[in-house]
C-alpha cells in the first residue's frame, strides 16, 4: 500500500499546492520529500510529508489553510485504489489535524472540503477529543450534506475503534452522541454511508453490546429494505 504514497504522489502534491497558490522551490520540496521516503511504511510516509509540507508552506496555519482551501480545484481525479497516487491527499487532510487543531473555526470547514479527496476520518479525531461540542455540532450538519463523502465522515470519523485511527475514549465510554448521528444516517441513499453506519455500530458493540442490540431491534421495527441489508452486517 505504501507505493500509493511514493514519488508520483509527491509530484502530484507539489503540482497541486503550487497551482493552489503555494510559493516554494519545487526542487527543494521534492528533495526534502523524497529523502528517506522509500525506507518508510505508509503511515510514517504520511507523517514525513506533513513535516515537509510544514517546512515549505506558510508557518501561519490560517495562511497555509488559504492554499489548501483551493487545492481541490486543481486535484486530478486519478487516485484509483492501488494506483501510485492513491494516498496523495492523506498527508494534506492530516496536515490540518497536525497544524490546525488550535483553529477549529478554519479547520473543520477545511476538512469538509478536503474529505472527498481522501477521507478525513483520521484527521477529524483530534478535533472530537479537543473541541468536542463544536465538532459535534458540525458533524450533525454534515449528516445532511449533499456530498456522500461528507456524510460518511460524520459516521466513519466517530467510530470509537476505527482501524488505523486513534481511538476515541470519550465515545468508547459513552457512545450516545454517536448513536444520535447514526440515527440521521441509517437510511442514507448511499450504500457507502450505510456501510459506515454498520461498521460504527460494530465498533460500539465491542463495549456496549446491549445498547447495539436495542438500537438494531428498534431500527428493524420500521426498516426499509436498505436498512435491513445494512443491519445484516452487524
Indicate residue ranges for each PLM-predicted region.
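Surface-facing alpha-helical segments and adjacent helix-coil boundary elements at the starts of domains
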Residues: 1-231
Amino acid at each position: 500500500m505504501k507505493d500509493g504514497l511514493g514519488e508520483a504522489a509527491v509530484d502530484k502534491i507539489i503540482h497541486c499546492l503550487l497551482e493552489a497558490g503555494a510559493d516554494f522551490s519545487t526542487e527543494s520540496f521534492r528533495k526534502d520529500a523524497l529523502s528517506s521516503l522509500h525506507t518508510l511504511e505508509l503511515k510514517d510516509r504520511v507523517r514525513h510529508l506533513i513535516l515537509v509540507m510544514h517546512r515549505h508552506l506558510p508557518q501561519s496555519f490560517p495562511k497555509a489553510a488559504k492554499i489548501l482551501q483551493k487545492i481541490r480545484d486543481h486535484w486530478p481525479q486519478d487516485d484509483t485504489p492501488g494506483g501510485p497516487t492513491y494516498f496523495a491527499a492523506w498527508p494534506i487532510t492530516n496536515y490540518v489535524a497536525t497544524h490546525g487543531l488550535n483553529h477549529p473555526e478554519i479547520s473543520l470547514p477545511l476538512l469538509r472540503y478536503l474529505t472527498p479527496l481522501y477521507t478525513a476520518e483520521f484527521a477529524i479525531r483530534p478535533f472530537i477529543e479537543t473541541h468536542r461540542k463544536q465538532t459535534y455540532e458540525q458533524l450533525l450538519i454534515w449528516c445532511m450534506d449533499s456530498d456522500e463523502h461528507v456524510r460518511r465522515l460524520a459516521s466513519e470519523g466517530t467510530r470509537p475503534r476505527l482501524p488505523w485511527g486513534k481511538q476515541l475514549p470519550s465515545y468508547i465510554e459513552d457512545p450516545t452522541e454517536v448513536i444520535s448521528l447514526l440515527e440521521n444516517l441509517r437510511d442514507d441513499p448511499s450504500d457507502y454511508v450505510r456501510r459506515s453506519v454498520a461498521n460504527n455500530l460494530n465498533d460500539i458493540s465491542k463495549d456496549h453490546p446491549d445498547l447495539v442490540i436495542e438500537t438494531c431491534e428498534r431500527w428493524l421495527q420500521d426498516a426499509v429494505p436498505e436498512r435491513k441489508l445494512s443491519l445484516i452486517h452487524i
